[in-house]
Amino acid sequence: KYNKNVKDCTNEEIYHGLLSWTKEQLKGRGYQEGKKKIYYISAEFLIGKLLSNNLINLGVYDEVAKYLKENGKELSMIEEIEPEPSLGNGGLGRLAACFLDSIATLGLPGEGIGLNYHLGLFKQEFKDHLQFETPNPWIQPESWLTDAGVSYYVPFKGFMLKSTLYDIDVAGYENKAIKLRLFDIDIADESIVGEGISFDKKDLLHNLTLFLYPDDSDDAGRKLRIYQQYFMVSNAAQLILDEATAKGCNLHDLADYAVIQINDTHPSMVIPELIRLLTE
């Protein structure tokens, strides 16, 4: 990647080289396919750092670690460079991530669907014995995200938002991969965040995918939460219908092509949204 010997590379260069190589290895293994697919919709996925997990599931972790050590590098130090995706917070997100790991390892056709949060929940910092909340950015020019080249339009009262779909490959242990599919808006604007994690909650055109679980202690925050959840499920429903019809589904037999699991109540609007789309 950098036309240099490993010994002469910085840890950052080695990390980005490993990132690119690992993504190619996952893509080369192919994806779990089948007529019927599991769609796991969740507001959060606490997937953790991916490099070491992917190397383990590809069966090459020890080999890579040995090669780096022979060249004066430590894989543990390389792993520290990777930013953790700010896509989840607690047990609900960890449950979702574990289900994806299981689906991939068992070799089942399936994928997770959620939102591509730019700044996560928040990052906790301490200064002068006081806690401060700051944004937790993680998206870099080179990351596990891959633009899927898929977009949908989601209607809201008075305006419409165009989505962009990004994929993260989830490796099954010694098996093919599945995809975590994350919807985003191209016009999300991180610059609207002020002190701490404060931002204009009414600016829905620019804040919709900034934060996981934005403050909902007022009407603007509650509206943002609802709009976030509807954006997620409308995109999910459109994706599910597109994939099913591409396989030959006539919509009357949708149950033969799709199984939908919703993680808690956040994605529950996918039920009326599917009905709305099917009746159009």
Which positions does each model-derived feature cover?
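A conserved ligand/cofactor-binding region detector
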Residues: 1-280
